[in-house]
C-alpha cells in the first residue's frame, strides 16, 4: 500500500432521478478533487436512489451502461477514482451494486451479498467477494447489511484488501447518533480485527419517493485506521449532505499488521468450519 487521500461524500440521492444524481456526484467529486482526493466514495444506490417498491426496477441500469459511462467520463475529466452505488439490471435480475470506476473505465463491481428480508422481494443476492487493485491500495467493498457479517469482511482481508469501503442507506435522521451508534463501533472493530482502513459513508436525507413517502437518512461518514481509531468524520448535527477528506497512511497499516500478535496471522482455520454451516 501507498499513502492515498480519500473523500467520502454523504450525498442525497433522488429516487429515479439519475441525471440529477450524476450531476450531484460530479459536483461533489469536483470539490473532493480540489482538496486532493484520489478516491471519492459515495453511498449505497447513490446513482439510482434507494426505494424498496415494486416499481423501483424501472430505474435499474445495465452495468456497463449509460450511467457507468458517465461515471467513467467524470473520473477521466477529474483524474480520480469513483465508487458509487447503482440498481443494476442483468438478464432480468436486479442487484444492489457498487461500481468502482477509474479514468479508463470500470475497475470492478460488487453486488450486495446479504439481502435482508425487506429487500429480498426486490433484489437478488450477489455471490462474489472481490478485491480491487487501485494502484496505491487494494480495496474491498461491503454494502450496508453485509457489514454485520464478520466473515464477509474477513474474506476480503484474506484476499488482500487493505481498505474496506462501506456504503450505506441506513435509516434515521440524526447524524451524530448514527456515528456514535454501536453499529458504527462494530464497523470500526472490523477494521481493527483485520488490520484495514474503513471508509464508511451513509445516504443523506430526507428524500421523497415516487409513491409519496419519504426516506430518512442521517447522512454522515467516517474513516477509521487499522487500529480502529477514527481519523476523520463528518461534522454537524443535521442529516444534510456532507463530505470528509482523509489521508490513509501506509505506515499505519504496516505497523498494525507487523506486530507478532496480529489477528490474521494467528488464525486457527481448522477450528472454524462451523462458521460456514447453515443454522
Language model region names:
Residues 18, 26-107, 170-194:
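Cys-nucleophile CN-hydrolase/nitrilase-fold catalytic domain and related Cys-dependent amidase chemistry
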Residues 2-6:
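Extreme N-terminal starter segment of soluble prokaryotic enzymes
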Residues 10-15:
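Short polar catalytic/cofactor-binding loops
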Residues 84-86, 97-100, 130, 221-223, ...:
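Short beta-strand scaffold segments in enzyme catalytic cores
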Residues 20-29, 149-154:
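Short, acidic/polar
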Residues 89-189, 254-255, 259-262:
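Active-site catalytic loop in hydrolytic enzyme cores
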Residues 63-81, 148-241:
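CN hydrolase (nitrilase-like) catalytic-core segments centered on the catalytic cysteine
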Residues 251-279:
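A conserved C-terminal secondary-structure "cap"
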Amino acid at each position: 500500500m501507498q499513502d492515498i487521500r480519500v473523500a467520502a461524500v454523504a450525498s442525497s440521492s433522488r429516487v429515479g432521478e439519475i441525471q440529477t444524481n450524476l450531476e450531484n456526484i460530479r459536483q461533489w467529486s469536483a470539490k473532493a478533487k480540489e482538496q486532493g482526493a484520489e478516491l471519492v466514495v459515495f453511498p449505497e444506490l447513490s446513482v439510482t436512489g434507494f426505494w424498496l417498491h415494486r416499481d423501483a426496477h424501472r430505474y435499474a441500469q445495465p452495468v456497463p451502461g449509460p450511467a457507468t459511462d458517465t461515471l467513467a467520463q467524470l473520473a477521466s475529466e477529474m483524474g480520480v477514482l469513483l465508487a458509487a452505488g447503482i440498481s443494476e439490471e442483468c438478464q432480468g435480475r436486479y442487484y444492489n451494486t457498487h461500481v468502482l470506476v477509474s479514468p479508463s473505465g470500470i475497475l470492478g463491481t460488487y453486488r450486495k451479498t446479504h439481502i435482508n428480508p425487506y429487500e429480498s422481494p426486490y433484489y437478488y443476492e450477489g455471490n462474489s467477494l472481490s478485491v480491487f487493485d487501485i494502484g496505491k491500495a487494494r480495496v474491498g467493498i461491503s454494502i450496508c447489511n453485509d457489514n454485520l457479517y464478520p466473515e464477509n469482511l474477513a474474506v476480503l482481508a484474506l484476499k488482500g484488501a487493505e481498505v474496506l469501503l462501506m456504503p450505506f442507506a441506513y435509516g434515521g435522521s440524526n447524524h451524530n447518533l448514527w456515528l456514535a451508534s454501536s453499529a458504527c463501533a462494530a464497523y470500526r472493530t472490523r477494521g481493527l480485527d483485520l488490520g484495514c482502513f474503513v471508509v464508511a459513508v451513509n445516504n443523506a436525507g430526507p428524500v421523497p419517493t415516487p409513491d409519496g413517502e419519504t426516506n430518512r437518512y442521517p447522512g454522515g461518514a467516517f474513516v477509521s485506521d487499522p487500529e480502529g481509531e477514527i481519523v476523520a468524520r463528518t461534522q454537524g448535527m443535521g442529516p444534510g449532505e456532507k463530505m470528509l477528506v482523509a489521508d490513509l497512511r501506509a505506515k499505519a497499516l504496516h505497523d498494525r499488521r507487523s506486530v507478532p500478535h496480529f489477528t490474521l496471522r494467528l488464525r486457527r482455520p481448522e477450528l472454524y468450519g462451523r462458521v460456514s454451516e447453515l443454522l
